[in-house]
């Protein structure tokens, strides 16, 4: 059995096989996931796991180069945004890089998810709790 954080086989595989600039989307329970996408459904019940718990676990194993968020999160979910940005700042320090954050419309965000190597659905039930993580290289 693995000793590292993530023990979900699908999620572990998705992270392990990411190449430079490939993306992984983490989303709330309501984001539409295209049928053609690699859906990694972690949602168990409302709020379990939370978006932030999912983000913390994924970023413990993934080197993040940049992130993409829907601009609507600024107005509709400032609490999650504040925690998310604080986490990305701490992660950047730990990784020794900057993690630029790009804000796009929710419609554009949904289109960008089509290119993700995986879409990880959490049990989060708050608006716009979604992020596209762009994979970097740790060297």
From Swiss-Prot:
List its EC numbers: 5.4.99.62
Q: What class of enzyme is it?
A: isomerase
Binding residues for substrate: 28, 106, 128-130
Major localization listed first in the record, in broad terms:
cytoplasm
User: Which molecular function term from Gene Ontology is one that the record holds?
Assistant: monosaccharide binding
User: Where in or outside the cell?
Assistant: Cytoplasm
What's a Pfam family in this record? RbsD_FucU
Any one Gene Ontology biological process term? D-ribose catabolic process
The pathway it acts in is:
Carbohydrate metabolism; D-ribose degradation; D-ribose 5-phosphate from beta-D-ribopyranose: step 1/2
CC annotations in GO: cytosol
Query: SUPFAM superfamilies of this UniProt entry?
Result: RbsD-like (SSF102546)
Q: Enumerate the Gene3D superfamilies for this protein.
A: RbsD-like domain
* Catalytic residue list: 20 (proton donor)
Which keywords annotate this record?
Carbohydrate metabolism, Cytoplasm, Isomerase
Reaction equation(s) it catalyzes: beta-D-ribopyranose = beta-D-ribofuranose
State whether it acts alone or in a complex, and with which partners, per the record: Homodecamer.
Role noted for this protein: Catalyzes the interconversion of beta-pyran and beta-furan forms of D-ribose.
What protein family is recorded? Belongs to the RbsD / FucU family. RbsD subfamily.
Provide the protein name: D-ribose pyranase
Q: Which organism is it from?
A: Actinobacillus succinogenes (strain ATCC 55618 / DSM 22257 / CCUG 43843 / 130Z)
